[in-house]
From Swiss-Prot:
Full protein name: Type III pantothenate kinase
Location(s) in or outside the cell: Cytoplasm
A molecular function (GO) term: ATP binding
GO cellular component: cytoplasm
EC numbers, comma separated: 2.7.1.33
Chain sites annotated for binding K(+): D129
Function comment: Catalyzes the phosphorylation of pantothenate (Pan), the first step in CoA biosynthesis.
Binding site for ATP: D6, I7, G8, N9, T10, N11, I12, V13, T132
Pathway info: Cofactor biosynthesis; coenzyme A biosynthesis; CoA from (R)-pantothenate: step 1/5
């Protein structure tokens, strides 16, 4: 098995992979002040919870948008697993043709998302990742990444609303029962949800209008589970791990 690690701005998600199948996942909060030993102990705990051991892990691959944390993770894997992990970045074969102004600016996580969507579902496909930011990336039928969009994630919007107002509280991000909110908490939850949902639906529609072609829409990321609207064809919470497994296979 291989260990796939997605280091994001808000969370680190660790996946135990058997080929392209995700055996188990483990989500922890991203903290730049954790030592490599602390991350190593978390990895061992995850393996134990997955009824696995370090001996079961043959290799590892990392996708990271937080360089400081990535370096700690690399050290932890070398020390606790005896593995120097593969890093998604320059020089790595992905099978994807990045046809954007600055290919190096495309985050490793988004590249893995696109690889996962294209290898699993084919193209053309619009990949939506709902995390700290909500991102959209369009992949054509030949596997070329042609366009990307970045906007505020719903969790980030909720945190900004609470921190920049005197009396509005922090609220849990959830799908509201109704848009007819009768108190402040429900009003915030419904407002945040439907504002974000409306943005997602309009953005998908705009892609269809400008591209004038049919394509699949695949959503992933921590918040995708609450936004399974009719315009989204597939919600795949392990999409990035499928992409990381695909990239790994091209480089061994």
């Amino acid at each position: 098995m291989i260990l796939a690690v997605d280091i994001g701005n808000t969370n680190i998600v660790i996946g135990l992979m058997e080929g392209t199948e995700t055996v188990d996942t483990y989500r922890i909060t991203t903290r730049s002040n954790h030592t490599s030993d602390e991350y190593g102990l978390m990895i061992l705990q995850f393996l134990q919870l997955s009824n696995s051991s370090p001996d079961d892990v043959q290799d590892a691959i990392i996708s990271s948008v937080v360089p400081k944390v990535m370096h700690s993770f690399i050290s932890s894997m070398i020390k606790f697993l005896g593995i120097d992990p593969m890093i998604i970045g320059p020089g790595i074969k992905t099978g994807m043709n990045i046809r954007m102004d600055d290919p190096r600016s495309l985050g490793a996580d988004l590249l893995a998302d696109c690889a996962g969507a294209y290898t699993t579902y084919g193209g053309p496909v619009l990949v939506i990742d709902m995390g700290t930011a909500t991102t959209y990336n369009y992949v054509d039928e030949k596997g070329a990444i042609l366009a990307g969009l970045i906007t505020t994630g719903i969790g980030t919007a909720a945190a900004a609303l609470a921190s920049n107002t005197a009396q509005l509280p922090e609220v849990q991000i959830t799908r509201p029962k109704s848009i007819l909110a009768a108190n402040t908490k429900d009003a915030m939850q419904a407002g945040l949800y439907y504002d974000c949902l409306g943005g997602i639906e309009r953005t998908i529609t705009q892609f269809r209008e400008e591209l004038d072609t049919d394509f699949k829409v695949v959503a992933t990321g921590g918040m995708s589970r609450i936004f399974d609207c009719p315009l989204i064809d597939i919600v795949d919470p392990t999409l990035i791990f499928k992409g990381m497994a695909s990239i790994y296979a091209k480089n061994v």
